[in-house]
UniProtKB/Swiss-Prot annotation:
This is Pre-mRNA-splicing factor CWC21. Residues 46-69, 109-119, 130-162 have a biased composition (Basic and acidic residues). It is found in: Cytoplasm; Nucleus. It comes from Candida albicans (strain SC5314 / ATCC MYA-2876). Residues 11-26, 120-129 have a biased composition (Polar residues). Associates with the NTC complex (or PRP19-associated complex). The NTC complex associates with the spliceosome after the release of the U1 and U4 snRNAs and forms the CWC spliceosome subcomplex reminiscent of a late-stage spliceosome.
Length: 162
């Protein structure tokens, strides 16, 4: 029962099975172990930096998106104001009155957009459960009722056997 000259010649009389185990208690680390650990740490720090950069990109994207939506809202308001101005000019209304009406419309639309944005803010709205969520909840309740019926059957069956 020896392996490469290591171990017992014969297991007879030794009260052992002769199984040979590797001694890893005094194992010497491979050359370059420290460098590989150092490389792992640098790799982890690079990944953390990449995660921060991607988070920054997402935040920048959100900011740009909000700026674009705000610009789009302002553009729609100005288009409506220009339509009113063209219509009033065709009717032959005085320029001072045109300017006053257009300014009034612009203020009205800005206030309306501001009120809509307040209504859309996530702090004031509470999420409502969707139809799918309600359906899932009902399905789970029905499934639980069916399981209760199975257990009841098992109880009745067990009572009859005794």
């Amino acid at each position: 029962m020896s392996y490469n000259g290591i171990g017992l010649q014969s297991v007879r009389g030794s009260a052992t099975s002769g199984h040979i185990q590797k001694n890893i208690a005094n194992k010497i680390s491979k050359p370059g172990h420290y460098e590989s650990r150092k490389n792992q740490k640098s790799l982890m720090s690079k990944r953390a930096d990449e995660a921060k950069q991607s988070q920054n990109k997402r935040e920048a994207y959100k900011q740009i998106k909000s700026e674009l939506t705000k610009h789009e809202q302002l553009r729609r308001i100005e288009v409506k104001c220009m339509d009113l101005q063209d219509e009033l000019e065709e009717q032959g209304v005085e320029p001072d009155e045109i300017k006053a009406r257009v300014d009034e419309l612009r203020k009205k639309l800005n206030n309306k957009e501001f009120d809509e944005n307040d209504a859309k803010s996530p702090t004031t709205t509470t999420p409502q459960p969707s139809r799918k969520d309600k359906q899932l909840k009902e399905d789970l309740e029905n499934e639980n009722k069916n399981k209760d019926g199975v257990f009841e059957y098992k109880r009745r069956y067990a009572d009859k056997r005794n």
